[in-house]
């Protein structure tokens, strides 16, 4: 695995949810979590920097980068949109351990309250993302608008949130973290 061309560490991910600057390298002695396109990678060191990347390719990341994946790819953008909210990073910081270089607590992160969506809302969200990002790529015409501006319009009211461990979710819309902890999205 020496010189993996798509290796991501906390140093490669840009602050304020701006993606990844470049890819690093690793050697065979480093433990690597493999990620796929449309996974959400989040730096777990100093979560207040809000380092997040919605992967556009596959590769590997080190243990300081958390990798989240929607089990059903059609919900990948929904997962990204939920995690893109500043409230997600505020929540991570509320359970972080350490003062000089705080780290998110994986168990705490997996209890992040996820909005409840009706089937109609889920279908509208999926259709919007087909138009915006995939089929036709209309979002490219909005390239002058920052990612932060585009996603700040997605509001997930607090009254529609439930802790992830409190309900069973349909198998089709579950997501999981690649570090072997379940992360559920409920409908």
Residue ranges with predicted function:
Residues 1-7, 93-96:
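Short coil/turn segments at secondary-structure boundaries
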Residues 3-37:
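Sequence-specific dsDNA recognition surfaces
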Residues 6-7, 99-100, 111, 142-148:
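Juxtamembrane/interface motifs at transmembrane-helix termini
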Residues 33, 40-86, 106:
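A short beta-sheet element
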Residues 45, 59-66, 97-126, 131:
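A short glycine-rich beta-alpha junction/loop motif
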Residues 116-187:
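Amphipathic alpha-helical coiled-coil/heptad-repeat segments
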């Amino acid at each position: 695995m020496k010189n993996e061309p798509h290796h991501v560490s906390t140093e490669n991910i840009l602050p304020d949810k701006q993606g990844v600057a470049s890819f690093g390298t690793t050697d065979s002695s480093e433990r690597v979590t493999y990620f796929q396109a449309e996974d959400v990678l989040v730096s777990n060191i100093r979560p207040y920097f809000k380092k997040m990347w919605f992967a556009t390719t596959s590769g590997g990341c080190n243990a300081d980068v958390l990798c989240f994946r929607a089990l059903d790819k059609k919900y990948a953008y929904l997962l990204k949109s939920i995690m893109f909210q500043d409230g997600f990073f505020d929540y991570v910081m509320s359970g972080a351990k350490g003062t000089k270089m705080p780290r998110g607590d994986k168990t705490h992160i997996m209890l992040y309250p996820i909005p409840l969506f009706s089937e109609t809302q889920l279908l509208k969200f999926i259709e919007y993302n087909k138009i915006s990002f995939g089929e036709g790529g209309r979002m490219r015409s909005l390239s002058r608008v920052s990612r932060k501006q585009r996603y700040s319009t997605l509001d997930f009211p607090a009254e529609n949130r439930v802790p992830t461990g409190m309900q069973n979710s349909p198998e089709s819309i579950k997501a999981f973290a690649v570090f072997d902890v379940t992360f559920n999205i409920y409908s």
